[in-house]
Amino acid sequence: MKNISLLGASGSIGTQTLDVLRSHPDQFRLVAFSVGKNIDYAVKVIQEFSPQIVSVQREEDVLKLQAVSGNTKIVYGNEGLLEVALHPDAEIVVNAVVGSVGLLPTLRAIEAKKTIGIANKETLVTAGHLVMEAARKHNVSLLPVDSEHSAIFQCLNGENEKRISRLIITASGGSFRDKTRDELHHVTVEDALRHPNWSMGSKITIDSATMMNKGLEVIEAHWLFGIPYEQIDVVLHKESIIHSMVEFEDRSVMAQLGSPDMRVPIQYALTYPDRLPLSDTKQLNLWEIGTLHFEKMNQERFRCLRFAYEAGKAGGSMPAVMNAANEVAVEAFLQKRIGFLTVEDLIEKAMNHHNVIARPSLEEILEIDAATRRFVMEQI
């Protein structure tokens, strides 16, 4: 029986993580979780799983939950997130919160020697050097939950990582993969939220449409697997059947395939190095699919992917700037305050405005994050 703490239980990854726990009640126990403002959902999860600690975003929601929570301790805010991440009984902390708020709980959980199931892209993007140093220092495993990084992780199982020639990350292309730049001037929020393959939260769905999601994954892969950016490629693969590939020195390529279902990589992170049945996911029948398609990525068509490579290669504090600018811009687009292509423009402005700090401390990263958010808000 593995004890699980779940950060971000009401989001897309969080709800699917609970599906996995639900499927294997003899294997997993939920000891703590956090939610944002979805209190009705939190009540249902408490009633089903009886966790010991639950964290909410706002102090005013604490009393609402305490009235129905029985013996569950209710906490709130950033301190509450840390309490969930540091639950003494938790063996695995699944970080499924959205945004850079996931950074500090991850670092503290690593220091407490918890195994980390990492679905929060921004943690490695903004502070990859700090996270990986801490993981090495405390001998902690970072297990990828993203389908692409899980695919690479599985392809590398038993392999000599020094023999890697290239990582090939696949991209569905998002909601607007078939639209021209001119057509993108007129797309709506509703259009952007219709992802062709995956069921995800609103922020990551917009990131998929701009291709920033894939850019964040490139930076994540660099840190997780220690591969230079020059050896990480992205290929457009509309079917989302091949989740990623690894090319070795002898030019052999290993790929991980499967139906697009996030519960598969989530469960693998929780069961690693073992596997368990996942009976209600769709079996992959290649004869039904028939043909798989691949296209080279156009980084002028998908400018956010180019920004991510530029930020990653610049290193230091630049990825944190790019990430903070993107979070503010995406939120403004979702609120219909800016157009779709303005997201790219705001990110570019923020990156051009910033002078890179080569090895920023945690405090500097948090300061840069806040300053970038203020700068971008002033541009809107």
Swiss-Prot record:
NADPH binds at residues 10-13, 36-38, 120, 122, 201. It catalyses: 2-C-methyl-D-erythritol 4-phosphate + NADP(+) = 1-deoxy-D-xylulose 5-phosphate + NADPH + H(+). Keywords: Isoprene biosynthesis, Manganese, Metal-binding, NADP, Oxidoreductase. InterPro entries: DXP_reductoisomerase, DXP_reductoisomerase_C, DXP_reductoisomerase_N, DXPR_C, DXPR_C_sf, NAD(P)-bd_dom_sf. Pathway: Isoprenoid biosynthesis; isopentenyl diphosphate biosynthesis via DXP pathway; isopentenyl diphosphate from 1-deoxy-D-xylulose 5-phosphate: step 1/6. Its cofactor is Mg(2+); Mn(2+). Mn(2+) binds at residues 146, 148, 217. 1-deoxy-D-xylulose 5-phosphate binds at residues 121, 147-148, 172, 195, 208, 213-214, 217. GO terms for molecular function: 1-deoxy-D-xylulose-5-phosphate reductoisomerase activity; manganese ion binding; NADPH binding. Belongs to the DXR family. NCBIfam families: Dxr, PRK12464.1. This is 1-deoxy-D-xylulose 5-phosphate reductoisomerase 2. The lineage of its organism: Bacteria, Bacillati, Bacillota, Bacilli, Bacillales. The gene is dxr2.
